[in-house]
Amino acid sequence: MSQERITVTSPLLPNLDEFNEMLKEIWASKWITNMGQFHKQLEQALCEYLKVPYISLFTNGTLPLLTALQALRITGEVITTPYSFVATTHSIWWNGCRPVFVDIEEETCGIDPDKIEAAITPKTTAIMPVHCYGKPVKMQQIQAIADKYGLKVIYDAAHAFGVEVDGESVLNAGDMSTLSFHATKVYNTLEGGALVMHDEQTKKRIDYLKNFGFAGETEVVAPGINSKVDEVRAAYGLLNLKQVDQAIANRQKVAQKYREALRNIPGIRFFDDMPGVRHNYSYFPIFINAEEYGKTRDQLYFEMREQNVLGRRYFYPLISTFSTYRGLPSASPANLPVATRLANEVICLPMHHELTNEDVERILKLIIK
């Protein structure tokens, strides 16, 4: 274990001198929070970069999920995926709704739209799909189902910063989309997130809800929360936006090296780029068929850790196996065969903009040997 540690990710950091200059501006203005100039600039810059009409910044990636459900007044049951980070389902639970798990597709690890209709009941009010690993789900098919049954669609797009299909941002699908700007993501604001919406009226409502419900100095129009982004994180985000394209390009090169080396290794499967999709290379999951590969996922995972190579088993275990949710009828493994199998096969390899050729070679040697 003497070799230097290779982590699964590494945060994109702005130039420290440039950041210090922006901090001086904040100190001089004494406007630290409450939608200051850098907050406004970042919202505008993100709208332009992401090709979306309206965006509202949040202090993390979970609060946009909670707020979207509140803003759309979602009740009853929400159809979602068990193969995600727990915040997806927790946001449903915290809003007093019942999550209903639907199995996933093997080719994207996203919710399988062919299985959604069977999960709809008179209590269903919304669908919350996830663009897992930044791979777009079948949005048109999901929207057709939502339109047929009068359901809202909220996309958890935490992994999908900058992802486009045929030149159109995936964030424009559904009723709203949420983003995470956590330090582990392709683009980060230290901690942060955002909610994307389609019209000015909804933008105003979201901005009220994230500011205690205030619509003016003395008027409260809704029971809101406090999830405003401060000027320090907004400044940090503005600087990171200038370098995110280069970071994604670096990630793409790593993905290409992984694919070239692993393509013909028995028992290892991975995703190729999807036609017409602009990917962000946020993750590089591989799936281990133990019989063909000669060892289990966990054997490889712990062997890598012993050599200071820290992959992650995203997403194991399934959300549906946690104590809060395992009693739900939809949480049964028999209802989720694809998700259950993939959760036991997956390892996300190290993937970030700072990986060197030597790092990648070291990782690949551990897998190929």
Regions found by a protein language model. Give the residues of each.
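N-terminal "arm"/small-domain region of PLP-dependent enzymes with the aminotransferase-like
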Residues: 1-32, 350
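Phosphate-binding glycine-rich loop
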Residues: 31, 35-77, 83, 91-94, ...
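PLP-dependent aminotransferase class I/II
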Residues: 37-45, 49-53, 114, 118, ...
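Structural detector of well-ordered beta-strand residues that form the stable sheet scaffold
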Residues: 56, 79, 100, 153-154, ...
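PLP-dependent aminotransferase-like
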Residues: 70-148, 152-157, 164
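Glycine-/small-residue-rich active-site loops that bind phosphorylated ligands and cofactors
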Residues: 84, 107-108, 134, 185, ...
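Conserved active-site segment immediately N-terminal to the catalytic lysine
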Residues: 155-189, 204, 216-221
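Short beta-strand-to-turn element immediately C-terminal to the catalytic PLP-Schiff-base lysine
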Residues: 179-180, 193-199, 238
